[in-house]
């Protein structure tokens, strides 16, 4: 029925086997274990001094200055943006917790 001899769709039709993704495709994806370990470390160790300063800058609305500082400390623009967003998220959670009380 669907088997034709020529063209792009030539040959015997088969259903494609769903394979597991390669290990290289997992890069950057946190496992549950790593996530929990990092949360415990963060709870015990707290924030680094530069992270506290970034949070202060974000509190007063100096987002660009906070990004510049993160970028200088972490080395790249993308890492700086990610850290700034992480710190902004922490501030939002803290504000939500204080409003809830």
Curated annotation (Swiss-Prot):
InterPro entries per the UniProt record, alphabetical: Ribosomal_eL36, Ribosomal_eL36_sf
Source species, domain of life: Eukaryota
Molecular functions per Gene Ontology: structural constituent of ribosome
One GO term describing the cellular component: ribonucleoprotein complex
Gene3D superfamilies the record matches: 60S ribosomal protein L36
UniProt entry keywords in alphabetical sequence: Ribonucleoprotein, Ribosomal protein
Protein family according to the UniProt entry: Belongs to the eukaryotic ribosomal protein eL36 family.
Name this protein carries in UniProt: Large ribosomal subunit protein eL36
